[in-house]
């Protein structure tokens, strides 16, 4: 007898998504630090080598100069923001799916899943942008040799003192440009892979842990293929001195292409791809397990 479809619960998505986000940050932050440092390093002078020659070089130099804590620099900001951010992300996805269903039995098409995923990206931008701004500033300050901020709270306090609440939301448009299409790809790919990995006659809810890990990991890779160019622009814009880019992302884009070519839009690609699989596998395992527990404890919630 087929299992009766359950109505999508945005509340369960909220709770399980928060835990999944914590798992993602803890596993993925070291290579996120490497990614941001590669994306924001200045062009090298003629005849001089760049500060970092690549992902492994940046990882090695950070570990040697700052220890393991250097790789986790700025993690407090995303940890503080990640529970509500991923909770809202999965809530937005659940809501997006529910809005397109006439009944719980309706199966959504992949374009509909993409649309629901894009809604989740809109939902998360308000939480994501301040955390990304603080995280990026803390991640690059050690490599630049200027320790302006002693930590997350100090950075938040000084940003507010200097720029007011708007200082936290520098880069909002670029965060939207990154997260809306990337979130659509993020969730659509995951649902497609789950369906692909589900044996005939079985439910996607019965997927084994290894298959959940593989589906979550590859979803992260597809997500970042879409997200890297706007992420490079966002990192550069959010860490730039005030007034450097008066026309926003257009100035950043022109400068990058003029000075470093189109390939500069994929700075940090190796770090992102190495990070994407384990971090997102951990995220979706961290989401699926609490969701199963919640469905067992409160099936009608």
Curated annotation (Swiss-Prot):
InterPro entries: Mitochondrial_Carrier, Mitochondrial_sb/sol_carrier, Mt_carrier_dom_sf. Residues 32-73, 132-170, 231-267 are mitochondrial matrix. One of its GO terms (biological process) is mitochondrial transport. GO terms for molecular function: carnitine:O-acyl-L-carnitine antiporter activity; O-acyl-L-carnitine transmembrane transporter activity. Keywords: Acetylation, Lipid transport, Membrane, Mitochondrion, Mitochondrion inner membrane, Repeat, Transmembrane, Transmembrane helix, Transport. It comes from the Eukaryota. The modification N6-acetyllysine is found at residues 148, 157, 170. Mediates the electroneutral exchange of acylcarnitines (O-acyl-(R)-carnitine or L-acylcarnitine) of different acyl chain lengths (ranging from O-acetyl-(R)-carnitine to long-chain O-acyl-(R)-carnitines) with free carnitine ((R)-carnitine or L-carnitine) across the mitochondrial inner membrane, via a ping-pong mechanism. Key player in the mitochondrial oxidation pathway, it translocates the fatty acids in the form of acylcarnitines into the mitochondrial matrix, where the carnitine palmitoyltransferase 2 (CPT-2) activates them to undergo fatty acid beta-oxidation. This is Mitochondrial carnitine/acylcarnitine carrier protein. It comes from Rattus norvegicus. The gene is Slc25a20.
